[in-house]
A protein has these predicted regions:
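Short, solvent-exposed loop/turn positions at domain surfaces
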Residues: 44, 390, 553-555
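Contiguous segments within soluble domain cores/interaction surfaces
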Residues: 20-39, 44, 50-51, 55-94, ...
Length: 672
């Protein structure tokens, strides 16, 4: 927001309106932006084309939609791989880290060749249905995007056809005039000009009086919205123009220092931006790719995506050529800028997004009675993650609802939920809210398939002299779990039998094993812990199989010892992690994976599930097509080392933003 406040202060000196009205307008715009901050995403990948079974390495730039600074508010970004039928092939969830949002998507084996798209979004971005962020990739070949005027009639705003708003872009400014037809009775109009909601002009305009905006007074670049308003500030007409993108760019230079060639045949390369302001730094991603595979013509880039695609409704992706040619004017005809309804904002009608910003992961659900399905108030809900040594408890509200916040665990983490009444009874029904992800229903960017490609892209780099190319070898290993204290349950247990203990004892049944535990007795097939008495008499210990409680009359002989990996006994204070049902002690049996069918023990108060956790970044493996991939570089300049052979056949691509929101983009063959 630093850049936004700075720009607004500058605009105060260039807005041709009385100071009092000007201050009101600026305060309303600023209030809307603060009340409903919007975001944009851009996906930078390690290549433009892939093969089935290959891994897509990516970084998502999440920026403020107004000033393009990376200090955005969402904690998570979702990335989906969509096939040509708009169906989700893979979905990952990225957590903000020191490197930004860095992750990968594995392309399944056997997928058909064609154009696929990477869709990226935050929960906050779902408030805008007509603004999507797509990145085209090609599997099994190469292709290029073609410019398109996407057609979508949703939410089109009607304007007065009796007034023509004419916008003429000049070298040193912009001339705005109106052509009013004879049947129009209105004579008093206002012209409102903004770029990404940043107001640039607000003043009177008439058929006899044109408005001239000088180049130096315009601080922004990208899509400008020229709105003609009547005396009640209702929008009469609107025109969009793509102008002065150079105002948003931060040019960089790449210089080779041949005189510093190192002994290992590597040459230093210095990347810097001479136009950086005081305190301004770059946050960029870098890749080096083989120049003979993908032609950069017909590909999108960060400039066209942030300045054009994400500011035009129903425009998911255009090639980078839209920023360089005369195409934007035809593509913007009859379009409206609708990230904010600016005609309402200048009236003081500011709105907030319906979907809140996702700042932490949450698990939600509901607890109700088995009969009548009535909500249970003050019910106890336990959340346990055996894999991550995690345990937390909460209570339900008057509607039987519960929620756990701050559940930040990686993908694949398994959870167990147990619900009970306030009195500790398990005769309840536990309902878990399923995660919902929006389907993509918009248009796919048009493209032209240029060539097929079956070349192995996971081949190694150029072999050194005397090297031997080996076939791919996969090595798998399995280490048996002999530890008796390997997860959250066993570490707090009073007594444990691990796999090694069970094998050394040679027990033939669980009863034989439990008789070795002090203060535990086995009578008539039930286990009792000494001291386990209630006002209703003596009660047996609870039995949990793989974290799920079974009925009190469950026969432990149903479990074969060959299927058991560990047995843990909880007595006294250690039973607190199991909730009220574990008050008489708990016998926890962990089976070998896949050998025990827990589904044969249906429990309405227990759920075992896995959520879409965040993805852990993986190291990049260089290949012949992309020998270098650096997802995150921050600073005012960078010094990289490249092998000398890169200078003849490889291309360097750098994209990112600066701390002040200026866009960084560089593409060029190394050494030229």
């Amino acid at each position: 927001m630093r850049k936004l406040l700075f720009v607004i202060l500058l605009i105060c000196f260039h807005t041709s309106l009385y100071a009092q009205t000007n201050n009101v307008l600026l305060s309303r715009v600023l209030r809307q932006v603060q009340l409903y901050p919007q975001e944009k995403t851009y996906v930078f990948t390690d290549a433009e084309s892939y093969q089935a079974g290959q891994r897509i390495h990516l970084r998502v730039f999440l920026v403020n939609a107004v000033v393009h600074q990376v200090d955005s508010i969402s904690r998570y970004v979702y990335v989906e791989l969509l096939n040509p039928e708009r169906l989700v092939v893979k979905r990952v969830r990225l957590l903000r880290s020191d490197q930004g949002f860095v992750g990968h998507i594995d392309i399944p084996e056997g997928v058909v060749k064609g154009r696929y798209v990477l869709r990226s979004y935050t929960k906050n971005m779902l408030n805008l249905s007509r603004y999507e962020s797509l990145k085209s990739i090609f599997i099994g070949g190469h292709g290029r995007l073609t410019p398109s005027k996407y057609s979508n009639s949703l939410n089109r705003e009607e304007t007065n056809n009796s007034i023509n708003l004419l916008v003429n872009v000049l070298k040193k400014g912009i001339k705005v005039s109106i052509d009013k037809l004879s049947n129009s009775s209105e004579d008093d109009y206002r012209l409102f000009v903004h770029c990404r909601s940043i107001p640039l002009y607000f003043g009177k305009i008439s058929k006899e009086k044109d408005v001239i905006l000088s180049y130096d007074s315009l601080s922004q670049g990208g899509i400008y919205s020229f709105q003609l308003l009547d005396t009640k500030l209702n929008k009469v007409a609107e025109r969009l123009k793509f102008v002065y993108p150079e105002k948003e760019l931060c040019p960089i230079s790449v210089r080779w220092t041949d005189g510093e060639k190192l002994n290992n045949n590597q040459i230093p390369c210095v990347i810097k931006a001479d136009s950086l302001r005081e305190g301004e730094t770059m946050d960029v991603s870098v890749r080096v790719e083989y120049a003979g595979v993908d032609n950069t013509v017909g590909q999108s880039d960060i400039i066209s995506h942030l300045l054009f695609d994400m500011d035009k409704a129903d425009c998911p992706e255009e090639p980078s050529s839209v920023c360089l040619e005369s195409e934007p004017d035809s593509l913007l005809d009859n379009c409206n800028w609708s990230r904010y309804r600016m005609s309402d904002v200048i009236k003081g009608e500011c709105k907030k997004g319906l979907i809140g910003v996702e700042k932490s992961a949450m698990i939600r659900g509901r607890v109700e009675t088995l009969i009548g399905h009535k909500p249970i108030k003050d019910g106890v809900v336990n959340l346990i993650s055996p894999d991550k040594s995690f345990y937390v408890v909460t209570k339900t509200d008057a509607q039987g609802r519960f929620s756990f916040e701050g559940i930040d665990f990686p993908e694949g983490t398994q959870y167990v939920l147990n619900a009970f009444t306030k009195a500790g009874k398990s005769w309840v029904k536990l309902l878990l809210d399923e995660d919902e992800y929006p389907s993509y229903k918009g248009q796919l960017p048009p493209f032209v398939w240029t060539s097929n490609d079956t070349t192995r892209v996971d081949a190694t780099l150029k072999l050194p002299k005397g090297g031997i190319q080996m076939e791919e070898v996969n090595v798998f290993s399995h280490q048996p779990t002999y530890s008796s204290r390997s997860d959250a349950y066993s570490r707090t247990a009073d007594f444990s039998f691990g796999l090694r203990d069970i094998e050394s004892i040679g027990a033939t049944c669980l009863h034989e094993l439990l008789r070795r535990v002090p203060s535990v007795t086995v009578e008539f097939g039930k286990c009792y812990v000494r001291g386990g008495f209630t006002v209703g008499g003596r009660r047996p210990a609870a039995i949990a199989i793989d974290g799920i409680f079974v009925n009190e009359d469950y026969d432990l002989d149903n479990i074969q010892m060959a299927d058991v990996e560990r047995v843990d006994v909880f007595k006294g204070g250690s039973t607190v992690i199991w909730g009220a049902i574990g008050g008489m002690g708990v016998i926890s049996v962990t089976t070998k994976k896949g050998d025990f069918k827990a589904a044969s023990v249906p429990l309405t108060n227990t759920k075992t599930f896995t959520t879409l956790g965040y993805q852990i970044p993986q190291a990049y493996t260089p290949n012949a097509r992309t020998p270098m991939w650096l997802p995150s570089l921050r600073g005012a300049s960078f010094r990289l080392l490249f092998p000398a052979e890169y200078r003849s056949t490889y291309r360097l691509i750098i994209e990112g933003v600066t701390s002040e929101g200026r866009i960084v983009h560089y593409t060029g063959e190394i050494g030229r």
